[in-house]
Amino acid sequence: MTRPVRTRFAPSPTGFIHLGNIRSALYPWAFARKMKGTFVLRIEDTDVERSSQEAVDAILEGMQWLGLDFDEGPIYQMQRMDRYREVLAQMLEKGLAYPCYMSAEELDALRERQREAGLKPRYDGTWRPEPGKVLPEPPAGVKPVLRFRNPLTGTVVWDDAVKGRVEISNEELDDLVIARPDGTPIYNFCVVVDDMDMGITHVIRGDDHVNNTPRQINILNALGGEPPVYAHLPTVLNEQGEKMSKRHGAMSVMAYRDAGFLPEAVVNYLARLGWSHGDAEIFSREQFVEWFDLEHLGKSPAQYDHSKLSWLNAHYIKEADNARLAELAKPFLDALGIDDAAIATGPALDAVVGLMKDRATTVKEIAEGAAMFYRVPAPDADALAQHVTDAVRPALADLAAALKAADWTKEAVSAALKATLATHKLKMPQLAMPVRLLVAGTTHTPSIDAVLVLFGRDVVVTRIEAALA
């Protein structure tokens, strides 16, 4: 194919968008970028009753968050109705389509008779014009549907980039309805006109569209268009092995942001959810674009693994800039009741994030760990009774005195802790646990010397001495 590469993502705005959906945007985006082509966003909103602006906004927001920028669009099918009607009129004029007056009840009865006879249920061509055929008289007051005049013989063939060579006999296909009685065009027809008008060269989409493909190819051929390369992606399964869907508990794309995942981690994970480059597990967006090809798309369903995504997210959090993570952590801190004013009273959030990020798998976890630096500690009474004993109080008093005089560095604080341990013949947990409780309000913190340095000398000494008073 010598045409410039043009790919598209064509979601229906009828609900939220999950990882399985957005993967059908990631791959055509990457292929367009790899081939220096054009990536088109098309909103297939002909299902007026189920489509919503809220769903469109969710699609746009999810793509923006993941950095899936489009070159053209969004193009809305509902804004192209005049074009569809123009093509329908041309097809009627050329005999490529015809009016069919068979009612839904008649069609149901026909299919039932076919099933009883052991035949495949299908439209029987009652209203299809043929040389020498006398058509029934159109019933009064009935508006017809329009049907595409599908070839009666021959085979539809395409070389699918994922499934290989696919052949479907035209005898298996009946004459597809392409417009409703009110003249509204049907999805399969609109898709063909759009792909033809937009010069789409590669259609990379879920394999739930495979059954539509032979019909779309026949319509495209009838209109004189050039069929694109098709790549039908296997289904994404959830952790229970079911098709990923909202009904089966799938999270929306933006729910991952709201849970504290980084977009680069989600993109990296999605890239590997149906495509591979050798054994590479971790790679940048730029590497993904450079390496991406259709030949290495998986042929089997890919199963979502939340622990794998969390592992990747932890990696990207460790690599991320502290200032960026601090900004991302602020909404989570705010949800914990810690606003900018509270943050201003404590240690620099960048530094706190730098300490917490090595232990976190999400930004939310960073915020939960950072919260202790911006709150008045309220340790559990039972924990205090367990750890702040009469036996350890003299050591706490000596430590407070040593910290008053020490240089305020991690090394000096560590030395003061070790000296106190030696003097009082204690092990580190016997001293570190009560210090953590009194200063931070919890026994779960990173390295005690690093934590104390961030709290600051005044806070640390004041809180220890207050407990001993």
Swiss-Prot record:
Enzymatic class: ligase
Positions occupied by motif 'KMSKS' region: 243-247
PROSITE patterns: AA_TRNA_LIGASE_I (PS00178)
Cellular localisation: Cytoplasm
Positions annotated to bind ATP: 246
One annotated GO biological process: glutamyl-tRNA aminoacylation
E.C. numbers: 6.1.1.17
Gene Ontology cellular component terms for the protein in this record: cytosol
Pfam families recorded: Anticodon_2, tRNA-synt_1c
Catalyzed reactions: tRNA(Glu) + L-glutamate + ATP = L-glutamyl-tRNA(Glu) + AMP + diphosphate
Keyword Transmembrane: no
Motif stretch ('HIGH' region): 11-21
InterPro entries from the UniProt entry: aa-tRNA-synth_I_cd-bd, aa-tRNA-synth_I_codon-bd_sub2, aa-tRNA-synth_I_CS, aa_tRNA-synth_I_cd-bd_sf, Glu-tRNA-ligase_bac/mito, Glu-tRNA-synth_I_codon-bd_sub1, Glu/Gln-tRNA-synth, Glu/Gln-tRNA-synth_Ib_cat-dom
Keywords noted in UniProt: Aminoacyl-tRNA synthetase, ATP-binding, Cytoplasm, Ligase, Nucleotide-binding, Protein biosynthesis
GO molecular function, a single term: glutamate-tRNA ligase activity
Assembly information from the UniProt record: Monomer.
Described purpose of this protein according to its UniProt entry: Catalyzes the attachment of glutamate to tRNA(Glu) in a two-step reaction: glutamate is first activated by ATP to form Glu-AMP and then transferred to the acceptor end of tRNA(Glu).
Family label: Belongs to the class-I aminoacyl-tRNA synthetase family. Glutamate--tRNA ligase type 1 subfamily.
The protein, known as: Glutamate--tRNA ligase
Organism, as annotated: Burkholderia cenocepacia (strain HI2424)
Upper lineage: Bacteria, Pseudomonadati, Pseudomonadota, Betaproteobacteria, Burkholderiales
